[in-house]
Amino acid sequence: MSMHDPISDMLTRIRNGQHASKVKVSMPSSKLKIALAQVLKEEGYIEDFAIAGEEKKPVLDIQLKYYAGRPVIERIERVSRPGLRVYKGSTEIPKVMNGLGVAILSTSKGVMTDRKARAAGIGGELLCVVA
């Protein structure tokens, strides 16, 4: 089976894993997925992540985070997708839940949150929103 949108697949695996109260989820690894996992870890949405498997087929393992038995991530959804890319300038980046959530962007300086992108004055492709 060919995968057309690996980022949507990653977000869906995280969402499904948390709905099923899984401790960790595994998926094929890529540089973009690792960068996205790093941002999620820095923002406190996941416990940790690790890269396992062989060099030719690395696997990304993400440890999910719960608080009082409930998933920390209430909402995680893809914004820009292969059929409709969404790009925002630094002044157009939306605030998620009035600043309680984060938007994750792919910029020329790497993958970062909406707050960091606004502070740096750069825009980019709006990958997903997390709350």
From Swiss-Prot:
InterPro entries per UniProt: Ribosomal_uS8 (IPR000630), Ribosomal_uS8_CS (IPR047863), Ribosomal_uS8_sf (IPR035987)
Cleavable signal peptide: none
Pfam families named in the record: Ribosomal_S8
UniProt superkingdom: Bacteria
Keyword RNA-binding: yes
Disulfide bonds: none
Presence of keyword Ribosomal protein: yes
Family that this chain belongs to: Belongs to the universal ribosomal protein uS8 family.
Function: One of the primary rRNA binding proteins, it binds directly to 16S rRNA central domain where it helps coordinate assembly of the platform of the 30S subunit.
Subunit structure: Part of the 30S ribosomal subunit. Contacts proteins S5 and S12.
Stated name of the protein: Small ribosomal subunit protein uS8
Organism encoding this protein: Chromobacterium violaceum (strain ATCC 12472 / DSM 30191 / JCM 1249 / CCUG 213 / NBRC 12614 / NCIMB 9131 / NCTC 9757 / MK)
Gene coding for it: rpsH
